[in-house]
Swiss-Prot record:
Originating species: Arabidopsis thaliana
SUPFAM superfamilies xrefs: RNA-binding domain, RBD (SSF54928)
Name of the protein described by the UniProt record: Organelle RRM domain-containing protein 1, chloroplastic
Domain RRM residues, every copy: 282-360
Pfam families (alphabetical): MORF_dom, RRM_1
Location relative to the cell: Plastid, Chloroplast
């Protein structure tokens, strides 16, 4: 099921003269539409808010250009910071985001050919698949998806309110049932199983948020698997992901009782998480954190369950930014067990976190001792 939200676009006419440009007052007319189509653009020497339109609006790639699969992409973003208010400032903001992947603003300016400023925030760009993967991992990027009809004047930036969003070409999406291997011992709750399935699916979709939106069912206690909306090409790719046993059509899409093992026995996947056996631990491992969540915020969220010995968010040594996961340690196992049960799947700074038992490091004494094996 797809949710399509139509939105109008303002298409800038193409001049036949290679030297003619459209200056700022025409680039952003008073009757502007939330979406703006443009070709390559650059800043003039007048000011950073004055943009110049080049005469090469995207309509079809040159015959000499060899395009890789999926070269045109639609990028959806979180709402820009409040100080990015004007339309020209938003374009600069979009360019800065893309420049983090391409390496410089000039290439980013040339690659962007459409932008949306109002209800939905984002842009369309012409980049290769490797760059699209890097772009999908940047903070503030909600999703990135191929845009097949890149020459269309009307762009649909809406992601909808349903899980079956328009990540794929219209009419190509099908419902699939995915059977997977039994997860590791650390996955003991439904929220952890959801996170595990998202990780598998994101190997195909490249973006965890897109993977979350495509999921619509998870089985996690007896039969292991999930159901999702994909096109056939993505389904074939998913079947080759390690840990995936089979990808078959979901012939019982309307039913909540899914037959992951080929029989019709009633499973117990809807039992309460509290029936899971208690885990003895003082240390917890938190994943799914927003890159902007601080140790102070994390401590405030967890200290209500007991005294904390340590709160440590793991930082990237190069970028000095959070990697999105952290470790917590309580003074008692009871406090840690309660926090594990109550906080798993909760929302912190707009992101759903997954709380797990912190695993000890593997025993590696044999590296420093002689081997007595045959």
């Amino acid at each position: 099921m797809e949710a399509l939200i139509a939105s109008t676009s303002f298409f800038v006419p193409i001049s036949n003269s290679s030297s003619s440009h459209i200056i700022n007052n025409r680039f952003f007319p008073s009757f502007y539409s939330p979406n703006l189509n443009f070709g390559t653009f650059r800043k003039t020497s007048l000011s950073s808010s004055h943009l110049v339109f080049s005469s090469s609006a995207i309509s079809a790639p040159p015959s000499s250009t060899v395009l890789t699969r999926n070269s045109y992409w639609m990028v959806l973003l979180d709402k820009p910071p409040h100080w990015v208010s004007s339309k020209s400032a938003m374009v600069d903001y979009y360019v800065e985001i893309l420049a983090k992947v391409l390496g410089n603003e000039k290439d980013a300016q040339v690659s962007i050919y459409d932008a949306s400023f109002d209800t939905h925030f984002g842009f369309c760009c012409h980049i290769d698949e490797d760059a699209s993967r890097q772009l999908a991992s940047l903070p503030g990027v909600v999703s990135i998806r191929p845009e097949q009809d890149y020459s269309s004047e009307k762009k649909n930036y809406g992601i909808g309110s349903h899980k079956g969003v328009s990540l794929f070409d219209h009419g190509t999406v099908k419902h699939w049932m995915v059977r997977i291997d039994k997860p590791g011992v650390g996955i003991v709750t439904k929220a952890q199983m959801v996170d595990h399935c998202v990780q598998l699916l994101s190997k195909v979709l490249w973006n965890e948020k897109d993977a979350q939106m495509c999921l619509y069912h998870v089985s996690w206690q007896s039969d292991f698997g999930f159901c999702c909306d994909l096109d056939e090409r993505s389904a074939v790719e998913l079947a080759g992901v390690p840990g995936v046993l089979a990808v078959v059509p979901d012939n019982s899409f309307e039913s909540l009782n899914k037959d992951y093992e080929g029989d019709s026995t009633q499973d117990s996947r809807d039992q309460d998480d509290s029936e899971s056996p208690p885990v003895k631990t003082k240390k917890l491992f938190i994943t799914g954190l927003s890159f902007y969540t601080s140790e102070k915020t994390l401590r405030a969220a967890f200290e209500g369950f007991g005294e904390l010995v340590e709160v440590k968010i793991i930082m990237d040594k190069i970028s000095k930014r959070s990697k999105g996961y952290a470790f917590l340690e309580y003074t008692t196992e009871e406090a840690a067990g309660t926090a594990l049960k109550e906080m798993n799947g909760k929302i912190i700074n707009g992101w759903m976190i997954v709380v797990d038992v912190a695993k000890t490091k593997p025993f590696r004494q044999n590296r420093s001792q002689p081997s007595f094996g045959l």
